[in-house]
């Protein structure tokens, strides 16, 4: 079939398998061009491995460090009539390309929050790798099914205490609007912590540790975003921020546990990037369009792949073997360039000046839209979008 982008809300409901593969190839090419990561781990588990930072982590480990990788994710396959999710095609492309280079790559597809996912992953590690040296936790899900009760818990992207009103961009109509978001209830705050906090990361690491599949010196990292006062009301000071603070709590508990065998647990605070997750957060698209333009001008712009390669090579697995620099909460900070005073001051001053008329001129809004479509495999150089493609891509993912 010939597949074109169809946008609904902040989701593109179609995906292009060839475009998704081209995306993965681009990230692999970048990683190889940077050269090998000297002290990289050799057996890596990535929970949430099919898109965004999780996918880039798997690529950095495999193509930057020569690691055997296991990926866990929840994606839908395509059929002859309907494309699957972008993450499905990303993961399929990754496996194919890794194996072509003689790298071990296996994936489990299903609910990563479930007990079954953890057990099947443990079984696979025991069977094929023995143990793992690194666990990346990169789940971004709006819903979590509690394994014990089957209850569905939903997160809320809302402020706390009062209604938040701000300038935002309507990405469907490309116009500047005033967006208001009602505050979260106590229950919604608790639920957001349950879905997006550190509990499931702890459950994963504890299950892996109890099964004896974590090697001595195993490092684990989970991803977070803090941002600046421009986004704090909806993010760090909102329900989502409470969940991210819970991630810090979990990191501290896990670090105590893993340090006994020479390992570590850290939250890595990353920069804002265009992902399906960030596009759903009110105000983020406009902020990203502003900050990207300034960071590009300053020569410090990074996408997912650049950030993660820097995290591996300059933080966790440095060439001289020295310990990673961390902040006062033991976090790895890769948002350091985004948070530079000159960059943030530029955004603060620009924010009130943005109108529908000057949006494309004063920000990287056009590039934001292009990057968004790229997530789904569209608008990529060298891909023939008039060609007939089969959305039914064969894989040997292990069903959870």
Swiss-Prot record:
One MF annotation (Gene Ontology) recorded for this entry: enoyl-[acyl-carrier-protein] reductase (NADH) activity
NCBIfam families reported in the protein's UniProt record: EnoyACPredFabV (NF043048), PRK13656.1 (NF010177)
Subunit structure comment from the entry: Monomer.
Class in the EC hierarchy, top level: oxidoreductase
Family from the record: Belongs to the TER reductase family.
Key words of the record: Fatty acid biosynthesis, Fatty acid metabolism, Lipid biosynthesis, Lipid metabolism, NAD, Oxidoreductase
Organism: Vibrio vulnificus (strain CMCP6)
Biological pathway: Lipid metabolism; fatty acid biosynthesis
Residues holding substrate: 225
EC number: 1.3.1.9
Active site: 235 (proton donor)
Highest taxon of the lineage: Bacteria
Plays an important role in discriminating NADH against NADPH, annotated site positions: 75
Binding residues annotated for NAD(+), in chain numbering: 48-53, 74-75, 111-112, 139-140, 244, 273-275
Protein known as: Enoyl-[acyl-carrier-protein] reductase [NADH] 1
A Pfam family matched in the record: Eno-Rase_NADH_b
Gene: fabV1
Function comment: Involved in the final reduction of the elongation cycle of fatty acid synthesis (FAS II). Catalyzes the reduction of a carbon-carbon double bond in an enoyl moiety that is covalently linked to an acyl carrier protein (ACP).
InterPro entries cross-referenced by the UniProt entry: Eno_Rdtase_FAD-bd_dom, Enoyl-CoA_Rdtase_cat_dom, FabV-like_NADH_b, Trans-2-enoyl-CoA_reductase
Transcription regulation keyword on record: no
Catalytic activity: a 2,3-saturated acyl-[ACP] + NAD(+) = a (2E)-enoyl-[ACP] + NADH + H(+)
Single GO biological process annotation from the record: fatty acid biosynthetic process
């Amino acid at each position: 079939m010939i597949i074109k982008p169809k946008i609904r809300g902040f989701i593109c409901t179609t995906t292009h398998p060839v475009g998704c593969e081209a995306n993965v190839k681009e990230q692999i090419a970048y990683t190889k061009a940077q050269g090998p990561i000297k002290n990289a781990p050799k057996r890596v588990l990535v929970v949430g491995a099919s898109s965004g930072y999780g996918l880039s982590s798997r690529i950095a480990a495999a193509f930057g460090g020569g690691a055997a990788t296991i990926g866990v994710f929840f994606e839908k396959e395509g059929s002859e009539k309907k494309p699957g999710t972008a993450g499905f095609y990303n993961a399929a492309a990754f496996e194919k390309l890794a194996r072509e280079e003689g790298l071990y790559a296996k994936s489990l597809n299903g609910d990563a929050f479930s007990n079954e996912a953890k057990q099947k992953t443990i079984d696979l590690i025991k069977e094929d790798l023995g143990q793992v040296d690194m666990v990346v936790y990169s789940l971004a899900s709006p819903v979590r099914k509690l394994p014990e009760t089957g209850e569905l818990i939903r997160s809320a992207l809302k402020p706390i205490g009062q209604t938040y009103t701000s300038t935002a961009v309507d990405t469907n109509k490309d116009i500047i609007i005033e967006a208001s978001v009602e505050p979260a209830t106590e229950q919604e705050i608790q639920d957001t912590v349950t879905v997006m906090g550190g509990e499931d990361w702890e459950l994963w690491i504890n299950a892996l540790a109890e099964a004896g599949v974590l090697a001595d010196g195993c490092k684990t990292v989970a991803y977070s975003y803090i941002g600046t006062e421009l986004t704090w009301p909806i993010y760090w000071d909102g329900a989502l921020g409470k969940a991210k603070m819970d991630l810090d709590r979990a990191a501290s508990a896990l670090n105590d546990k893993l340090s006994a065998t020479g390992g570590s647990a850290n939250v890595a605070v990353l920069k804002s990037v265009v992902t399906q997750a960030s596009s759903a957060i009110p105000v983020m698209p406009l902020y990203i369009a502003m900050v990207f333009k300034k960071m590009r001008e300053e020569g410090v712009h990074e996408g997912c792949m650049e950030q993660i390669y820097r995290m591996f090579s300059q933080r966790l697995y440095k060439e001289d073997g020295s310990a990673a620099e961390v902040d006062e909460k033991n976090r790895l900070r890769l948002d350091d360039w985004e948070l530079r005073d000159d960059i943030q001051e530029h955004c603060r001053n620009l924010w009130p000046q943005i109108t529908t008329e000057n949006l494309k001129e004063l920000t990287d809004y056009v590039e934001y839209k292009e990057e968004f479509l790229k997530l789904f495999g569209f608008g990529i150089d060298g891909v023939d979008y008039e060609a007939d493609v089969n959305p039914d891509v064969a894989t040997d993912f292990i069903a959870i």
